[in-house]
Amino acid sequence: TVLTVPNDDKDLWPTLGPQVCEFIEAYLIFGPGDLRGMPARLDQEKRAFIYRMYEVFPQDHPQAGRRRFKRVGLSLAKGQAKTELAAWIAAAELHQEGPVRCIGWRNGAPLGGPVTDPYIPIVSYTEQQTEELCYGTLYTVIHEGPLDRDFDAGLTKSGRRDGDGRAVPLAAAPSARDGSLTTFQVA
């Protein structure tokens, strides 16, 4: 695997980042810990990461509206709420109104819409890590927050109440699951 750091562009790319950040701060909460149940708040570093993560090709490009990056990685020091951030992004990707895909343009800016039938494996080295860390945080964020009515959240999977889309904790590579079309992954 080759990791490439994108160049600092002089021109800003269109991004769904502002819409994703607004969704997170309007509807999601902190998971287990001192801030449990408090409204989600993004610092400037996490906001910049989300803006970059959700950059799309411009309207006049042959791939207009498609994500600029297929994969993104984030490395932060311990205690920087990485698990919370992953759970918040997974919740936005899972929600039936999450503005995570470009569905059109308004005044040259991308409009965000949901994934039709998301499949989100939440992968860790061990099953215990998966359940106690990110999936456990995702469960808390959606089960104890304002979006609880939109999800059927359980200890083994969380999905939309309408039946389309789910997030599942896994302790192995998602590619080993035949027939599963991964739309977003937390590892």
Annotate each predicted stretch with a short phrase.
Residues T1-A187:
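Phosphate/NTP-binding elements of NTP-utilizing enzymes
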